[in-house]
Amino acid sequence: MEIKDLQDYVAIVNDWPKKGIVFKDITPLMNDGEAYRFATDKIVEYAKELKIDIIVGPEARGFIIGCPVAYALGIGFAPVRKPGKLPRETIEMEYDLEYGTNKLSMHSDAIKPGQRVLITDDLLATGGTIEATIKLVEELGGIVAGCAFLIELKELEGHKKLNGYDRLILMKL
């Protein structure tokens, strides 16, 4: 398998979750053991190069990408969630959506100062989620060593919010 083959495992769903949206569904990739392992292994290789201490992923698909990477590396995983979903003390970060704002939260003890962090997610779109996640990690004293995505939606230019941050993008659609 090659990276270019991964696109065969992304289903395009028109008008979901609402009219006018073209959704990139990664469940076919997850359903295929060879493709899922291949994508995970590429991110593991990237994380090894960066000497990562911990993986951070926003809910929910960031968990799907990040947890197997953390497991393969024998390191921890720290979830980033919507407010009110984590049971202990958290920090929060607001970010902009196309129409309004949203918030993400993280346990306030999830990252130790100086830890090298890899942020994982399935998709880089506008960059709002990744930007807020970076701010959460840095507020806790973590070093964002890199960001890894299965897919970047090129036309939404989310990569502009990652200036100065190393990144791995397996597919640009």
UniProtKB/Swiss-Prot annotation:
DNA repair among keywords: no
Compartments where located: Cytoplasm
Keyword hit for Transport: no
Record keywords: Cytoplasm, Glycosyltransferase, Purine salvage, Transferase
GO BP annotation list: adenine salvage; AMP salvage; purine ribonucleoside salvage
Principal cellular location given in the protein's record: cytoplasm
Catalysed reaction, written as an equation: AMP + diphosphate = 5-phospho-alpha-D-ribose 1-diphosphate + adenine
Pathway(s) per entry: Purine metabolism; AMP biosynthesis via salvage pathway; AMP from adenine: step 1/1
GO molecular function: adenine binding; adenine phosphoribosyltransferase activity; AMP binding
EC number: 2.4.2.7
Gene Ontology CC entries for this record: cytoplasm
Superkingdom of the source species: Bacteria
Pfam families referenced in this protein's UniProt entry, alphabetically: Pribosyltran
Role noted for this protein: Catalyzes a salvage reaction resulting in the formation of AMP, that is energically less costly than de novo synthesis.
Assembly, per entry: Homodimer.
Family: Belongs to the purine/pyrimidine phosphoribosyltransferase family.
Protein name as catalogued: Adenine phosphoribosyltransferase
Source species of the chain: Listeria monocytogenes serovar 1/2a (strain ATCC BAA-679 / EGD-e)
